[in-house]
Amino acid sequence: MKRLGSTFAIVAVFFGSSIAYSADAPIGKWQTVDDKSGKVESEVEVYQEGGKLFGKIVSLAEPTDANGQPKRCTKCTGADKDKPIVGLVIIKGLSASGDRYKDGTITDPADGKVYKAEVWTEDGKLKVRGYLGMFYKTQTWVKAN
């Protein structure tokens, strides 16, 4: 019985350490930063639902258009067409895979395009990569206060 208990302890330590190396869910609010100006453009709340990762825009630096109306995703297609950008779910259905989340999509509300997506944390920041075929672009988001 003593041997069974120590075997269980070894197995528990092994599995516990393998879980520690799985993707850390970057739950919380993140600021998107313009690559050229370095200014904060929006704040995205990343959350889990049904074991998958999602992210919705919760604020914009400039939330209204020239007419004072809330900005809308006019170039989006499908169910997101003409939805207000604040509240728009832009990261959809990412699954944990090793130290990253992938196999989902990200929408760029500026052009309405949907890209395959992958995210991971690095040095306390969130790396967000969108793929179009073999080409990709990676943005760095910073944790919001």
Q: What is each of the regions a protein language model found here?
A:
Residues 34-107, 112-117:
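Central antiparallel beta-sheet cores of small beta-barrel/beta-sandwich binding domains
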Residues 24-41, 135, 139-145:
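K/E-rich alpha-helical interaction surfaces of small helical-bundle regulatory domains
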Residues 1-8:
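Bacterial N-terminal signal peptides that target proteins for export
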Residues 108-109, 113-119, 125-137:
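Short, exposed beta-strand-loop hairpins at the edges of beta-sheets
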Residues 9-17:
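Bacterial N-terminal signal peptides
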Residues 18-23:
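Sec/Tat signal peptide C-region and signal peptidase I cleavage site
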Residues 120-124, 142-145:
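A short, sequence-level motif marking secondary-structure junctions
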